[in-house]
């Protein structure tokens, strides 16, 4: 958390305070991150936290982090973290103490960890983001288990076939088996590796 009231006053005096604000949906088109949304792929913004130097834009496809050097610099680095490639985990929400001005949400996308301070007056909105990220992480975990189970079942079936006597053209049977395995693995990944989590936010 960014600190207590006196620490915040000092930080504000030095221009260092960077408490994020949750942006209203009607203003999503005004944030920098909106320029990098893949509209052609059906990407849609569901949640935005904006601070003096950074934007955290949560979409149905993942997180767009518009990373700024400082509040006074116009230099920005846009980083994309897709649900399809990175699992959400370690989600925590820290509420404010008596003299705190901010609340804090922490989470990770794969190996990338984030910690965002937010105005404590927006706790209820931040709870919604917390719950959405936790649910997405749970779904990803279940899907990962389903993919692993599907692959193991396919492996056991192939081993059973390899131990049996093949009738007919062996090379043709092996070729057909490889094609089946490839298609089956694709189907398993497509079924259990979600790209779109918009329904969780809605």
Question: At which residue positions do the language-model features occur?
Answer:
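N-terminal recruitment modules of adaptor/scaffold proteins
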Residues: 2-75, 163, 170, 174, ...
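Acidic, Ser/Thr- and proline-rich intrinsically disordered linker/docking segments
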Residues: 2-8, 22-23, 28, 73-202
């Amino acid at each position: 958390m960014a600190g207590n009231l006196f620490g915040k006053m000092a930080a504000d005096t030095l221009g260092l305070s960077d408490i994020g604000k949750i942006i209203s949906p009607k203003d999503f088109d005004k944030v920098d991150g909106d320029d990098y949304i893949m509209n052609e792929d059906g990407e849609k913004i569901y949640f935005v936290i904006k601070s003096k130097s950074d934007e955290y834009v949560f979409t149905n496809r993942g997180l767009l982090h518009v990373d700024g050097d400082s509040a006074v610099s116009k230099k920005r680095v846009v980083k994309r973290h897709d649900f399809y490639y990175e699992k959400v985990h370690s989600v925590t929400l820290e509420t404010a103490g008596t003299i705190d001005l901010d609340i804090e949400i922490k989470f990770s996308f794969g190996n990338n960890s984030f910690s965002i301070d937010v105005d404590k007056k927006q706790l209820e909105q931040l709870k919604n983001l917390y719950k959405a990220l936790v649910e997405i992480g749970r779904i990803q975990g279940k899907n990962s288990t389903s993919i692993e189970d599907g692959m193991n079942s396919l492996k056991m079936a192939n081993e059973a076939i390899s131990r049996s006597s093949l009738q007919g053209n062996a090379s043709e049977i092996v070729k057909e088996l490889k094609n089946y395995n490839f298609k089956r693995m694709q189907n398993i990944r497509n079924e259990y590796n979600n790209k779109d989590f918009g329904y969780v936010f809605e």
